[in-house]
Amino acid sequence: AGDIIGVFDPGIFSIGDTICSPGHKVQFRGIPTFAPEHFALVRQKDTMKRKQFIKGTSQIAQEGAIQIFQELDAGMEEVIVGVVGVLQFDVLKYRLQNEYNCDIIMETLPYEFIRWIVNDDIDPKTLDLASDTKKIQDLKGNHLLLFTSYWSINWALEHNKGLELAEFGTN
């Protein structure tokens, strides 16, 4: 019992937002965030194009074409971009060049698996992880781990009592 409408959005709404009458409380389970399968470290070539880089990557991520991650305690100077298919890297590069006038440097990363840390009470900085595992966060502050193999996932679960990992995130 609802309508689907088109709304002009000046950047206020995100995919999955619900608009309803004031006073109505509506609660949905989050839309699953699907796990990307390919990762790259991305930064702008010209440091003077930082605003264009941030605006462009944020906009493209908001559209759902890419997911943006950061290393813990890192800024937006360089980000880890996750995609489902490698062609999305080409789309990112093209759009940043042509729509935002921002050339980028992209380095493919060896990670194949990403997992969301379910436990809110676990500090990811204290986890005992294999050397090929990277601790990251998404733009909403959720903590995640990047792995190169199933072996590394099992290592993390075996060496960190109570750690719960999810294959999908929720918004």
Stretches found by the model and what they are:
Residues 1-171:
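Structural and coupling elements of P-loop NTPases
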